[in-house]
Amino acid sequence: MKPVNDTEHWDVIIVGGGIMGCSAAYYMSRAGLRVLLFERDTPGSAQSGRNLGFVRQQARDFREVPLAMGAIRLWQDLERDLDRKLGWYQGGNIVLALSEDDIAQQFAWQKEAQGYGLDTQILSAAQVAGKLPGLAPGSNVLGAMFTASDGRAEPAQATRAFLDAAVEHGAEVILGQRVSKLETAAGAITGVRCAGRLYRAKTVICAAGAKSAALLRSLGIVLPQEIIRATVAKTEPLVVPFPHCVSCPMTGIRQAADGSLHLSVAGGEYDVRMDSVRYARWYMKVRKEQPEASRINYLSPLRGILSRGAPPPLADIPPTSDCVPPNPTRIEQALTETTDFFPAFSNLRVRASWAGYIDTLPDMIPAIGPVSTTGGLLVATGFSGHGFGLGPMVGRVLSQLIQGKQPGADISQFSPERFG
């Protein structure tokens, strides 16, 4: 990547090298816009490169479904469009049902999904067994929800592919540098400040994941963003294919391109930090209604002080400057539930594990789009652990908005200003 001269002027500056920022950089540079992207670590080093790798429409908040359906259409051709391997495989997504209440909820979701033209089916127990031949006979599975058009991809590989393709189209990149401020004048964006230097652009996309709220706060924008530390484990490779992404009651299972299984338990650790007090009122209802969703870690400030650094780097996971240790208890929970449902996996060993910070918002849907009080500023953050699959479509929509085109999906309900 060539050196960047801060005396120049760009059409668009993107803060954040996750899949949202990298896909936006690709679609905009392909359209001929001059793009500069900042990433404080390496591309995909936060949650974009550390998630489970599901690419799904199924079981989403219906406000996200049009985005998810548009994203699937893009994923189907991305390896050709980017001219790179992404580990894309369209094997469908299965959510197991273990009670009559589960079945009722799945039928209700499927009925509404039909109005969107989604191909979701409700499977009987026998049909589930046919799709998952290794399922334990005594697993008490009554049925499942299945969407055949859902798929999977390799998170870090896909994120990097978008950035590399963007660079081929002329995008410029600054890695290892943190943007400290969004600069404005007369109510409009003028650029960003990094390492004391001003980089100029009339349009800026803030896609900085868990760091977005702090950047926006200096402009008076309220974004009550919190972070959850989620853990993923990787097993040794299977000798047989496991084509579907599967959601057990608590554990998600995906087979990676190298044959290994990636496992993750729903929820994670809520690491208490300074912003926890600032945003507490926004999350009281969520924590009361979903106490199992995250475990509060009151000692997290000490973790950063006492730690000697982040866990050792892994070959296929981008390194990060954050100290984000995986939780061994979560790994054990994931292994236990996986082998309960699939006894043939009982001898699989965990080869690696990692964690990443999920940036969340109180209503569990993202903030996407322009900020009316600051001309030229757009936001893409708060994807609450289910943004990876949306990434291509979000990048394309941001590109369309900046070019003055009609966006390919309605994002009016994702306003970054909805929290006041």
Regions flagged by a language model, labelled:
Residues S23, L182-I305, I317-P328, Q333-F341, ...:
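Flavin-dependent oxidoreductases
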